[in-house]
């Protein structure tokens, strides 16, 4: 059956044709723009803005606007965008992903759509993967925008709010994904509109879009607060799981493919004895089951120096797609605390979640989203389904001359690494630069030791040593350079060939292991052969590589043994084996996509609720008039719920005392309503009596606060306090609910449907609690006039 998303993806030739037509139209204005003086060229910005206000669309302005900023690029930077870069710019303006090979000038390409989309004045955000690139691109490309009369802002994580606000007030703002994501969350915790910093989510252009939209999509952005100390539970769970034995007939099993671990029946029995409980999976033990599950995963599915490093007494995650340390990022659901318990370092409080959002749902809030990267085609179905973006492969300006050699496969790791070192030695002796890609810190350090023994000078770039990343990567194309880098360290920095290197064959790229994503392998290859340079790439693999162990190495091993290829130095170049490896990668990519999709499905439930709550907060903060029209209906609904709850059955059985208690606790300070006042009254009469009481109390406070602004601020404070308190509690409730349904999913339940159903009632209860608290806080507040 054909994937319905696949059917929606346009034919590549047809895609390119429409963008080539726009490039033709842009190039037709080249001479006209070149003939203008600087002042005349700069005046084009105001002309375009005026034409836009008078009804022309950005699509209609595109050819001239692109031609104008293209000419500005030439005058300011000395760089004139090629035709293929115009095509890339048109793809980006269309709200799609432009796949452009390494060295094809993505940053320069971006000047055209960024300039065009900044003309309406609603703000353009250019998002990068790190602060170095944010500042570098803003400084370099900012010269062009300033020349054309547009303002540029830079938003960094640690900036004070007034600087952030100024940055977002600019026509074009450069920022990292985490900085703007956290700004958005903090804006929706603000108490006044003046505290907010982000102006609007209009048009975003994402650099290294695959890294941000796909690789980072599983980890939500979380703003946390302090909570009860639960360190003891992490430590006890860690001590328990360290007593267990692995195996289906033992205590636990590990799913290496999914990076999960589960107790067997025998393990469950051991847990019940260890923790002195009757049934581990009773509802009352849901939290304990979660602690044990996270401890199992931390100890047996994640590994030091591969998934994380321990530095300065802290556990720091390694980004599996870049090899860098992910500063400030922590695993959610208690997994990070489980790492800390495992490693014996200080356990940092889990805290309550004050606000959270996935990057997927954050970027989907923009009116238009676009991105550029060197590799995205393998993920085009996901990008189409999640973000409604096409992936368009932009032609290279020069033909790619890099030669991608077939993989070579060894029986074991020793044979593979010996071959890698021999190949590096051969290339080093003739002066050809080598970039060696590794998947883990361990591998990079092992190779470094082997090269030291051979007397081969080299640089190592990994999560433990990334301070001079851009400098090391930039030098990797010089004669005789040998650079070992985990994954795609140095993305965004060009590797230019030194003098005479092209004659030696260009940059040689050696992969020491296939990554679980074909896209990351393609990125490593793409470091060589930029702008028509020569180069070559080859991957060296072994049956003991992680990917092979996880996916069917046994079958390949048997085949190699039948071919008498089972000693250290045996090497295989076999199409069937290469196909098996690609098949394994596709399986992992599918699993990772399923995981990201699951994260999105759960967060989509929260997204709908979050948008309602955040919109409500915004309306309250924006209000300059009394909020009576919002507040009094809240009070009436609260009265209805309380009265209805205590007037079921026959009238003689009504719980009038509880209604009076509600009045005393939430409506009135005078105690003027008693049970006797309610006796004999109908349900409707009781409600009307309480409505009247609430109205009198409301208008009494309005009279006491004769200053209109004071009254509005008082109403805002009460409402925002209630909303925030219960929303934060709701986030924690939803986290616990998700953990609970995931644990119960070991039965026959569909956890997502369970979650959606329970989330609806949990949300409704939160709304009821907000309205009750708003009623109580407002009505019982003692109003004192400010004395002047």
UniProtKB/Swiss-Prot annotation:
Quaternary assembly: Monomer and homodimer. Part of the essential Sec protein translocation apparatus which comprises SecA, SecYEG and auxiliary proteins SecDF. Other proteins may also be involved.
Catalysed transformations (reactions): ATP + H2O + cellular proteinSide 1 = ADP + phosphate + cellular proteinSide 2
Gene3D superfamilies: Helical scaffold and wing domains of SecA (1.10.3060.10), P-loop containing nucleotide triphosphate hydrolases (3.40.50.300), SecA, preprotein cross-linking domain (3.90.1440.10)
Localization of this protein: Cell membrane; Cytoplasm
A Pfam family recorded for this sequence: SecA_DEAD
Protein name: Protein translocase subunit SecA
Protein task: Part of the Sec protein translocase complex. Interacts with the SecYEG preprotein conducting channel. Has a central role in coupling the hydrolysis of ATP to the transfer of proteins into and across the cell membrane, serving as an ATP-driven molecular motor driving the stepwise translocation of polypeptide chains across the membrane.
EC identifiers of the protein: 7.4.2.8
Family: Belongs to the SecA family.
GO cellular component, one term: plasma membrane
């Amino acid at each position: 059956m054909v994937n319905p998303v696949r059917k929606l993806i346009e034919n590549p030739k047809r895609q390119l044709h429409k963008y080539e037509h726009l490039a033709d139209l842009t190039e037709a204005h080249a001479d006209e723009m070149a003939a203008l003086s600087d002042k005349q060229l700069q005046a084009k910005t105001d002309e375009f803005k005026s034409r836009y206000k008078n009804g022309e669309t950005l699509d209609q302005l595109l050819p001239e606007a692109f031609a104008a900023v293209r000419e500005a690029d030439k005058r300011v930077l000395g760089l004139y965008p090629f035709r293929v870069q115009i095509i890339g710019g048109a793809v980006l303006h269309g709200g799609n992903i432009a796949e452009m090979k390494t060295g094809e000038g993505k940053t320069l390409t971006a000047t055209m759509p960024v300039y065009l989309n900044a003309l309406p004045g609603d703000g353009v955000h250019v998002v990068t993967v790190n602060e170095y690139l944010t500042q570098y691109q803003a400084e370099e490309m900012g010269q062009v925008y300033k020349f054309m009369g547009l303002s540029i802002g830079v938003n960094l994580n640690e900036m004070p709010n007034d600087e952030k606000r100024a940055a977002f007030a600019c026509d074009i703002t450069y920022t990292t994904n985490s900085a703007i994501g956290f700004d958005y969350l903090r804006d929706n915790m603000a108490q006044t509109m003046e505290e907010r910093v982000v102006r609007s989510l209009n048009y975003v252009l994402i650099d290294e879009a695959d890294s941000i939209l796909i690789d980072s999509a599983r980890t939500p952005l979380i703003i946390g607060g302090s909570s009860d100390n639960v360190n003891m539970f992490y430590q006890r769970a860690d001590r328990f799981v360290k007593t267990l034995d692995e195996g289906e007939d033992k205590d636990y099993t590990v799913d290496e493919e999914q990076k999960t671990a589960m107790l067997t029946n025998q393990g469950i029995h051991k847990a019940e004895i260890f923790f002195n409980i009757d049934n581990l999976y009773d509802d009352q033990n849901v939290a304990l089951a979660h602690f044990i599950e996270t401890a199992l995963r931390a100890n047996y599915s994640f590994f030091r120096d591969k998934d994380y490093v321990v530095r300065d007494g802290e556990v720091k995650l390694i980004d599996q797609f870049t090899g860098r340390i992910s500063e400030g990022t922590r695993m959610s659901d208690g997994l990070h605390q489980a790492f800390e318990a495992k490693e014996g370092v200080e356990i940092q409080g889990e805290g309550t979640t004050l606000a959270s959002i996935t990057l997927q749902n954050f970027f989907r809030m923009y009116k238009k989203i676009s991105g550029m990267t060197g590799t995205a085609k393998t993920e085009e179905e996901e990008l189409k389904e999640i973000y409604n973006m096409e992936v368009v492969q932009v032609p290279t300006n020069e033909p790619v001359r890099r030669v991608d050699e077939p993989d070579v496969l060894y029986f074991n790791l020793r044979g593979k690494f010996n071959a890698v070192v021999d190949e590096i030695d051969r290339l080093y002796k003739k002066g050809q630069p080598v970039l060696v890609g590794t998947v883990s810190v361990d591998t990079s350090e092992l190779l470094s030791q082997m090269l030291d023994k051979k007397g081969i000078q080299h640089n190592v770039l990994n999560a433990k040593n990334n301070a001079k990343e851009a400098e090391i990567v930039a030098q990797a194309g010089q004669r005789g350079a040998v650079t070992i880098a985990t994954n795609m360290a140095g993305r965004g920095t060009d590797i230019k060939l030194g003098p005479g290197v092209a004659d030696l064959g260009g940059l040689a790229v050696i992969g020491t292991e296939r990554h679980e994503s074909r896209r990351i392998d393609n990125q490593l290859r793409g470091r060589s052969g930029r702008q028509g340079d020569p180069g070559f790439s080859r991957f060296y693999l072994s049956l003991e590589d992680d990917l092979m162990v996880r996916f069917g190495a046994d079958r390949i091993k048997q085949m190699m043994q039948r071919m008498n290829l089972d000693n250290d130095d045996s090497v295989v170049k076999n199409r069937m084996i290469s196909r098996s490896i690609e098949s394994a990668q596709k399986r992992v990519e599918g699993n990772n996509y399923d995981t990201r999709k699951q994260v999105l499905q759960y967060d989509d439930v929260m997204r709908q609720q979050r948008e309602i709550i955040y919109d409500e907060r915004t309306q309250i903060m924006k209000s300059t008039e009394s909020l009576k029209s919002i507040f009094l209906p809240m009070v009436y609904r609260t009265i209805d719920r309380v009265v209805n709850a205590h007037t079921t059955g026959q009238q003689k059985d009504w719980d009038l005392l509880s209604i009076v208690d509600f009045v005393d606790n939430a409506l009135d300070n005078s105690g003027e309503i008693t049970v006797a006042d309610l006796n004999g009254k109908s349900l409707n009469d009781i409600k009307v009596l309480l409505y009247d009481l609430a109205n009198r109390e409301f208008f009494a406070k309005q009279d006491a606060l004769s200053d209109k602004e004071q009254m509005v601020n008082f109403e805002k404070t009460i409402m925002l306090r209630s909303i925030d308190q219960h929303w934060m509690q709701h986030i924690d409730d939803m986290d616990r609910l998700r953990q609970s349904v995931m644990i119960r999913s070991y039965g026959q339940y569909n956890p997502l449907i369970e979650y959606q159903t329970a989330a609806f009632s949990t949300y409704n209860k939160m709304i009821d609690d907000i309205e009750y608290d708003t009623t109580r806080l407002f009505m019982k507040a003692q109003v004192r006039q400010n004395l002047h």
